Amino acid sequence: MAIIYLILLFTAVRGDQICIGYHANNSTEKVDTILERNVTVTHAKDILEKTHNGKLCKLNGIPPLELGDCSIAGWLLGNPECDRLLSVPEWSYIMEKENPRDGLCYPG
């Protein structure tokens, strides 16, 4: 029975690890990573979503903050067009459009 517990414990511990690495190819561009400086870019994948199906998930029952036509900078720096966001009591993550209309500049 103790062996089963040890195997389950080892499996749980290994499942909590995050591995950061890179692949080899013939690129010459250098970047700084979390772990190293001046690393040759060897494999890149854009992990930002470019399309959306219209559904946003709640995290732990808390909905996201949908900025609509506001940018994060406009919201934080006080663009009056973004004032409606000030009354949101809590949010789990922020959803910003790619090119929001109301950024740092506003009419007036």
UniProtKB/Swiss-Prot annotation:
GO cellular component, one term: membrane
Gene3D superfamilies in UniProt: 3.90.209.20, Hemagglutinin Chain A, Domain 2 (2.10.77.10)
One BP annotation, GO: fusion of virus membrane with host plasma membrane
Keywords: Clathrin- and caveolin-independent endocytosis of virus by host, Clathrin-mediated endocytosis of virus by host, Disulfide bond, Fusion of virus membrane with host endosomal membrane, Fusion of virus membrane with host membrane, Glycoprotein, Hemagglutinin, Host cell membrane, Host membrane, Host-virus interaction, Lipoprotein, Membrane, Palmitate, Signal, Transmembrane, Viral attachment to host cell, Viral envelope protein, Viral penetration into host cytoplasm, Virion, Virus endocytosis by host, Virus entry into host cell
Residues making up the signal peptide according to the UniProt record: 1-15
The organism's place on the tree of life at top rank: Viruses
Residues carrying sugar: N25, N26, N38
UniProt membrane topology term: Single-pass type I membrane protein
Localization of this protein: Virion membrane; Host apical cell membrane
GO MF, one annotated term: host cell surface receptor binding
PTM info: In natural infection, inactive HA is matured into HA1 and HA2 outside the cell by one or more trypsin-like, arginine-specific endoprotease secreted by the bronchial epithelial cells. One identified protease that may be involved in this process is secreted in lungs by club cells. Palmitoylated.
Subunit comment: Homotrimer of disulfide-linked HA1-HA2.
Further remarks about this protein from its record: Major glycoprotein, comprises over 80% of the envelope proteins present in virus particle. The extent of infection into host organism is determined by HA. Influenza viruses bud from the apical surface of polarized epithelial cells (e.g. bronchial epithelial cells) into lumen of lungs and are therefore usually pneumotropic. The reason is that HA is cleaved by tryptase clara which is restricted to lungs. However, HAs of H5 and H7 pantropic avian viruses subtypes can be cleaved by furin and subtilisin-type enzymes, allowing the virus to grow in other organs than lungs.
Protein function: Binds to sialic acid-containing receptors on the cell surface, bringing about the attachment of the virus particle to the cell. This attachment induces virion internalization of about two third of the virus particles through clathrin-dependent endocytosis and about one third through a clathrin- and caveolin-independent pathway. Plays a major role in the determination of host range restriction and virulence. Class I viral fusion protein.
Record-stated family: Belongs to the influenza viruses hemagglutinin family.
Name used for this protein in its record: Hemagglutinin
Gene assigned in the entry: HA
